[in-house]
């Protein structure tokens, strides 16, 4: 897929009339450190998910301090998370690597400052007994997607593991039915992701999974900001402080997954009613596992692995998803990682240890979840 729109056209078309260069001019990019709340915008069109638990934990325990913050769901169009940041409607977006590369292709001057997804979050689901350890088996097969746009997620992953993507048939089966259709016998595989893996299991959809976190060489979603904010000393410091609160929330979730899950449940009761304590906690733990990544190889929460990003941009170039050479060092910034990881770990540990779980959350057996964590994964040993 090649993106030929110029920057102006990209902003006008994808904003759906909500954000355009002509209507907001220079946006709010010149706003000083805290003359308005620091706005984070979701790529999903909803905040009613477990994915953002570090924010809700940080808000609950005051880790943001005096910072004014705001979370916005944004439109369901996944590219809005980069458009809104570029145009000053938000301060930080959370794009997938594919959407970030799309923004760079269209000359949006953004920088990734925090790699939430240290390893690849995306999986491929198969009916029980049909799972593949070698995805070359998908050549000539049909992969079900919730949205046709997800082909841009699948192609780089498949290309990286040696699949001829021109031989894979994609079918837009629709959200949220694509997993159900796979279970009913349609197609041969479906795109999934960590967190959703537990969600589907909780809904009775039993699959075998090829896990990206085990076999994909790519990273997952990251936080991006305007380059001008990185270069502005006041905004730079504000971003450091903001990310430190996220790091504390991530540390809390690592120490007490059930508590982090309960905090999201209390913020959004619909999430609890949808998942329940057991599978809600497992879903959160799957996400936390992606956020932590291969910890011994990382330099703290949020650290980008340059090799993973280089591999991703090389794959998108080979597939024609990007037409220009992307300089990884210019768009991936690890300068915030050290300062953001300098926090009071004793305070976070005490908060995690003293959190009072509700009766139903206290009944969730984390050791059982851990023992069965990869039971339905075909490409994870042990």
Put a short name on every predicted segment.
Residues 310-382:
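Conserved C-terminal helix/tail region of periplasmic/extracytoplasmic solute-binding proteins
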Residues 34-194, 210-217, 360, 364-379:
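Short, glycine-/small- and polar/acidic-enriched structural segments
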Residues 62, 67-68, 89, 94, ...:
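Sec/Tat-exported extracytoplasmic proteins
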Residues 2-3, 9-30:
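N-terminal export signals
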């Amino acid at each position: 897929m090649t993106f030929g729109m110029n920057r102006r056209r990209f902003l006008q078309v994808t904003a759906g009339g909500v954000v355009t260069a002509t209507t907001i001019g220079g946006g709010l990019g010149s706003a000083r450190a805290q003359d308005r709340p620091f706005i984070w915008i979701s790529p999903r069109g909803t905040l009613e998910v477990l994915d953002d638990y570090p924010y809700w934990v940080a808000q609950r325990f005051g880790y943001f301090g005096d910072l004014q913050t705001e979370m916005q769901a944004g439109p369901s169009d996944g590219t809005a998370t980069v458009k809104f940041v570029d145009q000053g409607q938000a301060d930080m977006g959370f794009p997938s690597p594919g959407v970030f590369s799309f923004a760079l292709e269209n000359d949006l001057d953004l920088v990734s400052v925090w790699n939430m997804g240290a390893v690849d979050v995306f999986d491929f689901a198969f009916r029980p007994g049909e799972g593949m350890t070698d995805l070359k088996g998908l050549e000539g097969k049909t992969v079900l997607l919730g949205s046709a746009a997800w082909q841009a997620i699948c192609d780089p992953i498949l290309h990286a593991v040696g699949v001829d993507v021109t031989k894979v048939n994609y079918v837009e089966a629709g959200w949220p039915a694509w997993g159900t259709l796979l279970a009913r016998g349609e197609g041969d595989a479906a795109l999934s992701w960590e967190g959703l893996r537990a969600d589907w299991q909780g809904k009775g959809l039993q699959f075998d999974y090829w896990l990206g976190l085990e076999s994909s060489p790519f990273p997952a979603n990251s936080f991006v900001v305007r380059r001008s904010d990185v270069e502005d000393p006041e905004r730079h410091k504000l971003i450091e402080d903001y990310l430190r609160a996220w790091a504390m929330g991530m540390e809390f979730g690592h120490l007490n997954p059930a508590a982090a899950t309960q905090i999201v449940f209390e913020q959004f009761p619909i999430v609890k009613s949808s998942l329940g304590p057991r599978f809600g906690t497992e879903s959160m733990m799957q996400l936390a596992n992606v956020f932590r990544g291969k910890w011994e190889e990382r330099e703290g929460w949020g650290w980008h692995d340059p090799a993973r990003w280089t591999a991703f941009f090389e794959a998108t170039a080979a597939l024609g998803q990007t037409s220009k050479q992307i300089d990884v060092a210019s768009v991936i910034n690890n300068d915030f990682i050290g300062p953001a990881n300098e926090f009071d770990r004793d305070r976070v540990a005490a908060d995690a240890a003293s959190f009072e779980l509700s009766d139903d959350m206290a009944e969730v057996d984390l050791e059982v979840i851990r023992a069965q964590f990869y039971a339905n994964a075909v490409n994870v040993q042990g």
